[in-house]
Structure formats: structure tokens, C-alpha cells
From Swiss-Prot:
Gene3D superfamilies: NAD(P)-binding Rossmann-like Domain. This is Uncharacterized epimerase/dehydratase SAOUHSC_00535. Belongs to the NAD(P)-dependent epimerase/dehydratase family. It comes from Staphylococcus aureus (strain NCTC 8325 / PS 47). GO terms for biological process: threonine catabolic process. GO terms for molecular function: L-threonine 3-dehydrogenase activity. The lineage of its organism: Bacteria, Bacillati, Bacillota, Bacilli, Bacillales. PANTHER family: L-THREONINE 3-DEHYDROGENASE, L-THREONINE 3-DEHYDROGENASE, MITOCHONDRIAL.
Amino acid sequence: MKKIMITGALGQIGTELVVKCREIYGTDNVLATDIREPEADSPVQNGPFEILDVTDRDRMFELVRDFEADSLMHMAALLSATAEKNPILAWDLNMGGLMNALEAARTYNLHFFTPSSIGAFGDSTPKVNTPQVTIQQPTTMYGVNKVAGELLCQYYFKRFGVDTRSVRFPGLISHVKEPGGGTTDYAVEIYFKAVREGHYTSFIDKGTYMDMMYMDDAIEAIIKLMEADDAKLETRNGYNLSAMSFDPEMVKEAIQEYYPNFTLDYDVDPIRQGIANSWPDSIDTSCSRGEWGFDPKYDLASMTKLMLEAIEQKDTVKNNN
């Protein structure tokens, strides 16, 4: 990869992906795009940025041509809970945007990445150590989008030879950008509330285990997969990916190592709880590890320490300004 265009660059993943890619490949070699302008304090501000509605194919093609991109990372999407509230919009944005991005990759011979998700699984999927190849019958519009997206990526690889690469992300946890619209968002919100209020009310019930990953590991995985030897990759629809599996009570106990008085209670959101119940408790990542060397560095304990320290530092800086 030498010239990279990233859609959805102001999202939770996109923001940190832009920063890391600019560190590695050079600021001027990474074009960030999103449907709105970045805020004044956004780290995306320090390099090339263009407005892009991913449902506008002509505009997407124009940006790819003008930037002379050789790689496209398509991150723009509505997340699970938001998509469930707006299923028509979710289909139009998630699928229309992906089709435009894949067509751009086909037309301009781009290396292509787009994320899938554990949301691609459903009630009939094996819940524990979910295999790489298994039943995928999701019960949400977001999940339907992700399964369709996986199949499209596989189709474009087999039919047109497009170098498509993807991973099924678990819940992603980061202190850089507060979340919005995801079922796993509780696992981010809980850290901010622990530092700022000493209490959190979880919309996901105790005993609900979901796969998670610290954002640094997720960004590293994207770059590692994109740089991997093409000949070693046997999966083109989406690699299973995870670093840990936990429920809200386990996060509470990890936080209490640093904030002993932290408390947790529950006000379960039936929509997001229903989504969570349809997802695996844990997934098998052996294909990712074997084919391109996926090796996450962070577990719950080390992630908790970093999250709390980063939020404390962020709030200290904000209060001193």
C-alpha cells in the first residue's frame, strides 16, 4: 500500500485507522473521507480530507482517480443498534456504499478492505468457539448487511479478481472516540462513567458474554492483513477475529482494581440485548492466526488499565484548558 483512501474516516474505527496509516505511510498518502467535516480537535484534521457520501458513486470514483489511490479501506456504515432502528437507511447506506466501493476497487484495480462483524452470526450459529465457516443466519438488518457484504467481497474476488480482504470484528474498545449506535458500546461507556461518575447503568445484562478487542489490536490487524502475502490468504469473505470474551460483571471487577468504589447496575435495552443474545459467546480465530499472523496484545486486565489512564489524562487536559 502506498496511497490509501479511507471512507467513514470520522467513525470509531476510521479515526484511529487514519492516524495509524498516516504514521506508517505518510500523512499526504492517506486520504480521509466522510459525509461531514471533522471537528476542530479531530486527529483526522492533520492531512488530506474530502467530503464523501458513499452512496454517490461518481464522487467516490472521482476521489479515487484524483488521489491516485492504490488501496481503498471502506469503513463507512450504520452500526447494529442504529441500523435496527432505521433498516431501510441501513440497507441503502451499508449495501449501496459497499457496492460503490467494490466497483471502485474493480475499476481502478485497488487493494480493498472492508470490515465484517460478529453481527454476521445469528441464533443458529454455534455459540462457543464459533468456527470460521459456519451457519450465518443473523436476526438483524446490520447482520444481514454484513453477510451480504461478505458474499459480495468473495464474489468480487472470484468473479473479477479484486483483492478483497475483511475481518469479522468483535466489539471494539477505545478511549479516542466515544461510541454511538453499537450493541457492544457498553464496554466503552463503562470506562468513561467509571472515571467521571463512579457508577454505570448497563443496557446489556449480566451473564451476556461477547467477543471484544482493544482498538490498537484492531488497527494492527487491519494493516497486518492488508500487508499479508496474497498467496497465503484462503478466506475472502471475512476472518474471525477476537482478543477476549467477557460480560459486564467481569469489566466491573477489572475496574474495581483501580476504582474500588465503582458500582454497576442494569437497565436492559431489549433491542440491544436481543441483538447480543443472537451473537456468539466466543469465536475461533485459528485461521487469522495461521494465515496472516494475527496476534492480539491486550487482554481485559491490560486494556482496563490503559483505558482508565487514558480517560483520566484526557479529562485532566480538558479541565486545565
